[in-house]
Amino acid sequence: MLTQQELKQQAADAALELVEQVAGPDVIIGVGTGSTADLFIDGLACFKGRLRGTVASSERSAARLAGHGLAVLDLNDVQSMPIYVDGADEIDPNLHMIKGGGGALTREKIVASVARRYICIADESKLVERLGRFPLPVEVIPMARNAVARGLSRLGGQPALREGFVTDNGNIILDVAGLSIADAPGLEKTINDIPGVVTCGLFALAGADVALLATQDGIRRLERRG
C-alpha cells in the first residue's frame, strides 16, 4: 500500500506530465505552496532551460524554485500562463477547495487568476463531499482582527488566531472551524466582503479546472463541469 507521501509524489508526477505537454522557451508555469507543491517544484527542476520561468505564490516556493536553478519571475511582468499547479487542504466534486493551510492563500488566488488552467494536485484523502472539516483560513489585516472575528462568529464560525504566524503580505490568519459550507461560492463572497478581510481560503468562485487525485489504483482525474 502506498504511503500518503508516495501518493503526493504520484499527484506531483501527474502534473509534471502536463508541464511536458506545454513546455517551451516562452512558457511560464505558476506554482503553489505546500507539501505537495514542494514535490512538484522538485520535479520541475528537470525542466530547467526548457521554460522561460515560473511564478511563485509564496516566498517559500520562490526560494525552493530558485534553489533548483529555475527562474522566478515577478507576476507584474507576466501576462499569462498555461497552467497553475497547487495542492489543496480539501476539494469537493465541484472542484471547490479550501486552501491556506500554509498561509499563502492570497497570493495563491492572485497567481492562479493569471493562469488559463488551475491544476489541483492532491492525494485522495483531500476529496470530500462537502467542504468544512478543515478549518477555513482567512487572511486579515491585523487592526481588524477582533472585528473580523465577530463577523465570522455571526456566520456560525469559531475563529482562532494562528499564533505566531504572519503572511508574506504582513497580515494574520484566522482559522475558522464550525462553518456549514453548503454554498461555497456564496460563503466565499460573504466572508470576503467583511471589512478587514484580505481574502478567505475558499476557492469556489474560481475553483480548480482539473484535479489530479492520487489513489492506490493510480490517478483519478476530475474536471470542472461546464
From Swiss-Prot:
One of its GO terms (molecular function) is ribose-5-phosphate isomerase activity. Homodimer. GO terms for cellular component: cytosol. It is an enzyme of class 5 (isomerase). Belongs to the ribose 5-phosphate isomerase family. The active site is at E108. This is Ribose-5-phosphate isomerase A. Coiled coil: none annotated. NCBIfam families: PRK00702.1, rpiA. It comes from Bordetella pertussis (strain Tohama I / ATCC BAA-589 / NCTC 13251). The lineage of its organism: Bacteria, Pseudomonadati, Pseudomonadota, Betaproteobacteria, Burkholderiales. It comes from the Bacteria. Catalyzes the reversible conversion of ribose-5-phosphate to ribulose 5-phosphate. It catalyses: aldehydo-D-ribose 5-phosphate = D-ribulose 5-phosphate. Its EC number is 5.3.1.6. Keywords: Isomerase. InterPro entries: NagB/RpiA_transferase-like, Ribose5P_isomerase_typA_subgr, Ribose5P_isomerase_type_A. The keyword Isomerase applies. HAMAP family: Rib_5P_isom_A. Pathway: Carbohydrate degradation; pentose phosphate pathway; D-ribose 5-phosphate from D-ribulose 5-phosphate (non-oxidative stage): step 1/1. GO terms for biological process: D-ribose metabolic process; pentose-phosphate shunt, non-oxidative branch. Pfam families: Rib_5-P_isom_A. The keyword Isomerase applies. Substrate binds at T33, G34, S35, T36, D86, G87, A88, D89, K99, G100, G101, G102, K126. SUPFAM superfamilies: D-ribose-5-phosphate isomerase (RpiA), lid domain (SSF75445), NagB/RpiA/CoA transferase-like (SSF100950).
